Amino acid sequence: MKKRLLSVILTAVTVLSMTACGVSAPEVPEAAPAAETPAAQAPATETPATEAPAAEEAATPAADAITLVMAEVNPLDTIVGMTDQKFKEEVEARSGGSIIIDLQASGVLGSENDVLDTMLGGGGTIDISRISAFALTSYGGQKSMLLSLPYIFTSREHFWNFATSDLAQEFLQEPSENGSGVRGLFYGEEGFRHFFTSYEIEDINSFKGKKIRVSNDPIMNGLVEGLGASPTVVAFGELYSALQTGVVDGAEQPIANYKSNAFPEVAPYMILDGHTLGAIQVIITDEAWNKLSPEQQDILVEAGKVASEYNRSISEEKEQEVLQELKDSGVTIIEVDDITPWQEAVKPVIEENIKGLEDYYQKIVDMK
């Protein structure tokens, strides 16, 4: 009898234990870790704890939560990656978990052009992306092309005078108004862009006859040609190997992106010409936008404002921090004392690309 009673008690305990395990599992969301820690990203320890979304602050996803997939070509420890994380954090907190941002970084969803093609093709596989402002030029964002003109911004303050203006809002909405299927949420910047090479350089004359990587962008093509070099289109994801094998001799990127993508390993020379301030914007497809309620749309807009301000607060400090790390690691950094020859070399590019947009160009120039 005692043995039978003991057997019953043990069976009951086992059943209760299995039941307890069954109800506890769903409390841990499965999607969040994959979205926040792409396989190719840099170790989480590289991003200061105060600058990354804290896990304990994340909103618990609602049962009927809308998940928006967000693409980022760079790692999360870059200026743009950190800005993306801030946007994700703000959206999820402000929506109480009714909107989840599935952030996929380090180019796992493709290059900027790949991502844009996917977004414009519909289907909802990618809903949001952080892109270079000029990337929309071929997709109904002609005004945004002005933001990548060489030396249009004389300082960061000049850029932010534009980015916080009514004119910026007009630029953000242009693609949607032209029927391209995407709209801008907010602007930011990733620092001034500089050329870097696999060979030793001294000044502007060091580029003559060299192959310099460009994206499929007419302004960058013109800029490189103005330096006497040969523009060579290479996908961003293939740039490291292209530099390593000599397919190209150099390229250009903001300082933080140059380091995070390990380009110093194959191109350890950088000249600080600052030809363009890397204006960025975060865009969303009209398809994704239209499935949100007006309240949820407002949440994205307000979260974008916070992320934009955050971007402004970290950009210069992060850039200087990385620049010092590059110098300490042995990268050859060449200062440019006189920018005049560079400005003269790119005048034809500016004159050609402001045709029909002269008034907008002048408005931006006057904001400095």
Please tell me what each predicted stretch does:
Residues 1-67:
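Short, low-complexity disordered leader/linker segments with a strong preference
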Residues 160:
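N-terminal glycine-rich phosphate/adenylate-binding segment common to multiple enzyme folds
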